[in-house]
Amino acid sequence: MPMASPQTLVLYLLVLAVTEAWGQEAVIPGCHLHPFNVTVRSDRQGTCQGSHVAQACVGHCESSAFPSRYSVLVASGYRHNITSVSQCCTISGLKKVKVQLQCVGSRREELEIFTARACQCDMCRLSRY
């Protein structure tokens, strides 16, 4: 049987790697949209309520920690001996979606909620919204 050329083998391995990765989005590093079910109520008693699939941002972003440079040590009075850099999975774009609420009887209401439109790895913040 004749051997395949090196170009054919490289192409085959590339196609194999791409098709294997299609079903593994959760394993891919980064920050991605992730759907979840949310129940919306008009008040605490649940007079009107409805459900909707909203989008969240879920994933892993890069972080690292390393010994601080000498200039950082001196500037901090030798208290800042470790420097860490990190990013968090963050919502970078929102959109409003309308949720239909079913009320007591046959009455209906409509309510707007926010859902994630886009995600990205960004600076970690205690509270952004």
From Swiss-Prot:
GO terms for cellular component: extracellular region; extracellular space. Its main location: secreted. It is found in: Secreted. PROSITE patterns: CTCK_2, GLYCO_HORMONE_ALPHA_3. GO terms for biological process: adenylate cyclase-activating G protein-coupled receptor signaling pathway; cell surface receptor signaling pathway. Residues 1-23 form the signal peptide. Keywords: Disulfide bond, Glycoprotein, Hormone, Secreted, Signal. Found in a variety of tissues. GO terms for molecular function: hormone activity; protein heterodimerization activity; thyrotropin-releasing hormone receptor binding. Glycans are attached at N37, N81. Glycosylated. Disulfide bonds join C31-C89, C48-C103, C57-C119, C61-C121. Functions as a heterodimeric glycoprotein hormone with GPHB5 able to bind and activate the thyroid-stimulating hormone receptor (TSHR), leading to increased cAMP production. Plays a central role in controlling thyroid cell metabolism. Heterodimer with GPHB5; this heterodimer interacts with thyroid-stimulating hormone receptor (TSHR), and hence stimulates cAMP production. This is Glycoprotein hormone alpha-2. It comes from Homo sapiens.
